[in-house]
From Swiss-Prot:
Belongs to the MurCDEF family. This is UDP-N-acetylmuramoylalanine--D-glutamate ligase. Coiled coil: none annotated. It comes from Burkholderia ambifaria (strain MC40-6). Its EC number is 6.3.2.9. GO terms for molecular function: ATP binding; UDP-N-acetylmuramoylalanine-D-glutamate ligase activity. It is found in: Cytoplasm. PANTHER family: UDP-N-ACETYLMURAMOYLALANINE--D-GLUTAMATE LIGASE (PTHR43692:SF1). Cell wall formation. Catalyzes the addition of glutamate to the nucleotide precursor UDP-N-acetylmuramoyl-L-alanine (UMA).
Length: 502
């Protein structure tokens, strides 16, 4: 379970969800445990004690002395930035002493490897990206389930991977397929993780305060791929396509792309438009008599295919709104097909999926105006995707804690789609300065409630009022879900005023 180590002493840093899962897993396997957190009484400490886990707890600043006493593995919680000076010093000391530094994902990878010696060989699918991870992860899980597989969905999406694995072992119900949502934080400490197929949905500015630079952030995303992983890449995103192997490389045949245009390479996915209808399509070899032959020819690379667009389903048959969600659906389909699941049940499942709360979720239509909750849109890339995905006139509500982002990517979609922008929160002035060149009316509001009511007055039939803040919520709210609740309450008030229902 721990590489070549037997019941090692483990230092767990941070007692969040992943840290608690690491502690549980290590205690389960008889490891000596030391747990450290910068907080004297972290919320999960009570859970740790209630479960009777035998561990030394140290509260306060991290120091290299935490490694003393025989520590063999450091288990690092994903919320802790390795750039933080005290943690950086501790990690440097661990490296000097040849002490392994693992995150939960590496513990999970090592556990699967150990279980493999007993014959357990599940398929593992992984999804990362700045935006769309949760939607694509849940959708991929549903596709695999509808194909008759036992599926476990875990990771950044919750539950923690190790908790889900422990439950599967206890219930003698190990899944056929693992579908993992992985953040850049989780991938930062990946060492031997090698899923069967993995997708990078997009890479835009986010968490730069944690990683230090965009290049470091992108590099962390790239750790989702192992040496034999099928790569599912968004060809519309230049940062993602940097992870595509060179043409003719040994692993080029294990690369699949998706995008919002017609695919040109065999086995890729995209959209094709005909008579005003957008279709999800796959590029196929017109001359191949069957799929097996087509895949063999792609792998061997000795045949130049005559490409045809195979229609899979109309994009309008998806229940999730927006072109960005069509891209997410293509990524999920590509992942499931990469492990040879049959297409027919996957396509039925695509029509079934209803989407996730707070992710471009239409919560009401009042007087022919859609009210759309995208409170999970906590970065610029998410808001750009929502604007371009809805592709209609929009009154946008944006603002909050910008986390040092560059708001410039908002200029083009705001100029194209927005009737007006309502600004809230700490970084409203920075967004206003950036969007001034668009000529779109901008209005500042002290509260989200005021912004929603003002947006409703400006919206015209056929428009959408979109809450997609491009910012974190903590300057005004407990979290993005609290922000969404306030938005929904304001929309309910508007419905009552207009004599409508939501």
């Amino acid at each position: 379970m721990f590489g070549d180590r037997q019941r090692p002493m483990v230092l767990v840093l941070g007692l969040g969800e992943s840290g608690l899962a690491i502690a549980r897993w290590c205690a389960r396997h008889g490891c000596r445990l030391r747990i450290a957190d910068t907080r004297e009484a972290p919320p999960n400490l009570a859970a740790l004690q209630a479960e009777g886990i035998d561990a030394e707890f140290v509260g306060g600043p991290f120091t290299p002395s935490l490694l003393d006493g025989g520590v063999e593995i450091v288990g690092l919680s994903p919320g802790l930035s390795p750039l933080e000076p005290a943690l950086a010093a501790l990690i440097a000391a661990a490296n000097e002493r040849a002490i392994a530094v693992w995150g939960e994902l590496e513990f999970f990878a090592q556990a699967l490897r150990a279980l493999g010696t007993s014959g357990y060989q599940p398929k593992v699918l992984a999804i990362t990206g700045t935006n769309g991870k949760t939607t694509t992860t849940n959708l991929t899980g549903l596709l695999c389930q509808r194909s008759g597989k036992k599926v476990a969905v875990a990771g950044n999406i919750s539950p923690a991977m190790l908790d889900r694995l422990a439950r599967a072992i206890d219930e003698t119900a190990l899944p056929d397929v693992w579908v993992l949502e992985l953040s850049s934080f989780q991938l930062e400490t990946a060492r031997t993780f090698a899923p069967d197929a993995a997708a990078i949905l997009n890479i835009t500015q986010d968490h730069l305060d944690w990683h230090g630079s965009f290049d470091a952030y992108a590099a962390a995303k790239g750790r989702v791929f192992g040496a034999t992983t099928t790569r599912v890449l968004n060809r519309d995103d230049a940062a993602v396509m940097k992870f595509a192997p060179a043409a003719g490389a040994a692993d080029a045949a294990r690369t699949v792309t998706f995008g919002l245009n017609e695919p040109a390479q065999q086995g890729d996915y995209g959209l094709s438009r005909d008579n005003g209808i957008a279709w999800l399509v796959e590029a196929v070899d017109r001359d191949a008599p069957d799929e097996t032959t087509s895949r063999r020819r792609k792998r061997d690379g000795v045949h130049t295919p005559d490409i045809a667009q195979k229609r899979l389903m109309p994009a309008d048959a998806l229940r999730i709104r927006g072109l960005h969600n069509a891209a997410n659906a293509l990524a999920a389909f590509a992942l499931a097909r990469a492990i040879d699941l049959p297409a027919a049940p996957l396509l039925h499942a695509l029509r079934e999926y209803r989407g996730e709360a707070h992710r471009v979720e239409v919560i009401a239509t009042i007087d022919d105006v859609d009210y759309v909750d995208d409170s999970k849109g906590t970065n610029v890339g998410a808001t750009v995707a929502a604007l371009d995905g809805l592709a209609q006139k929009i009154v946008l509500i944006a603002g909050g804690d910008g986390k040092g982002q560059d708001f410039a990517p908002l200029v083009a979609p705001v100029a194209r789609w927005c009737r007006a922008v309502m600004l809230i929160g700490r970084d409203a002035p920075a967004i206003r300065d950036t969007l001034a060149e668009t000529g779109v009316p901008l209005a500042d509001h002290a509260t989200l409630e005021a912004a929603v009511h003002a947006a409703a007055e400006l919206a015209e039939p056929g428009d959408a009022v979109l809450l997609s803040p491009a910012c974190a919520s903590l300057d005004m709210f407990r979290n993005y879900a609290h922000r969404a609740d306030v938005f929904r309450a304001a929309v309910d008030e508007i419905a009552i005023d207009k004599g409508a229902t939501t």
